């Protein structure tokens, strides 16, 4: 199966589990907002990036060439996978109207410093400003795919961020669950404060320890996933209204893969999750496994 991707790790990692798959075009680290008004100026230092892949992705974002790269390969493509992971960091809006995706790679190349000097501002994901620009960008992307005859070959991977690590229960999102997490943090703080008093710390230091309890890794993942899934809601609904085919998973249905090749993150899942996604993807495409 010949695959094109406009997205990031959710789609790319899924491809590793698709039988006989071949990724012929991969557009990553690029928000759809930069398609219409890309920077088109060589004012970022791509030389600081050690990976040729990273350099190509930032260069593509600066050129706004993501849609064209896929359309130019239309005859070689069996399926186009879309996901929204790379929208999560927002984009830089420059005073001349141009935009740069706020990827980690672009930041390493100096986009933040350039933006500060140029009077640009960061348009954060989830804001009304971001959403309005994103809607126009996504409509433009899908129109390009449709014109190239790829609309029926496009599948949206609508996979919510996982709120729990592999082997753990999904965190409760109601008030009882929230109060339970807060109570556990208070108990950890109390134990830490008690130990500090026993070890000779003063009352002020112990009180500070009690107040400033660090969240556990699991709690941080749960909080990040809950907030991101909330912000993604209207974006996902919009994609579903435009793209006919989709594979969806809610947060409670997936888990963070502890042994994921790129490390544990709410958008890095277990092998069994990817296998399940692939099974549904093949059904969407009218194909059987194998």
Locate predicted features.
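Extracellular glycan-modifying ectodomains
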Residues: 1-290
């Amino acid at each position: 199966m010949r695959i094109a991707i406009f997205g990031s790790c959710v789609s790319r990692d899924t491809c590793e589990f698709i039988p006989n798959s071949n990724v012929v075009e991969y557009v990553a680290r690029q928000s759809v907002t930069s398609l219409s008004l890309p920077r088109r100026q060589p004012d970022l230092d791509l030389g600081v990036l050690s990976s040729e892949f990273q350099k190509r992705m930032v260069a593509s974002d600066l050129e706004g060439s993501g849609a064209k790269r896929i359309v130019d390969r239309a005859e070689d493509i069996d399926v186009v996978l879309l996901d929204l992971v790379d929208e999560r960091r927002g984009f830089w809006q420059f005073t001349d109207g141009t935009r740069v995706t706020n990827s980690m790679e672009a930041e390493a190349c100096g986009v933040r410093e350039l933006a500060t000097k140029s009077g640009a501002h960061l348009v954060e994901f989830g804001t009304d400003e971001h959403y309005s620009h994103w809607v126009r960008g996504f409509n433009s992307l899908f129109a390009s795919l449709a014109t190239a005859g790829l609309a029926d070959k496009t599948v949206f991977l609508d996979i919510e961020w996982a709120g729990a690590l592999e082997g753990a229960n999904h965190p409760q999102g109601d008030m009882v669950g929230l109060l339970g997490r807060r109570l556990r943090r208070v108990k950890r703080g109390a134990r830490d404060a008690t130990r500090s008093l026993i070890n000779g710390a003063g009352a002020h230091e112990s009180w500070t320890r009690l107040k400033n309890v660090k969240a556990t890794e699991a709690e941080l993942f749960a909080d990040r996933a809950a907030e991101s899934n909330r912000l993604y809601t209207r974006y996902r609904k919009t994609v579903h209204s435009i793209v006919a085919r989709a594979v969806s998973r809610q947060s409670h249905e997936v888990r963070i893969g502890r042994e994921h090749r790129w490390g544990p993150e709410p958008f890095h899942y277990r092998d069994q999750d990817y296998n399940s996604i692939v099974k549904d993807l093949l059904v969407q495409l009218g194909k059987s496994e194998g």
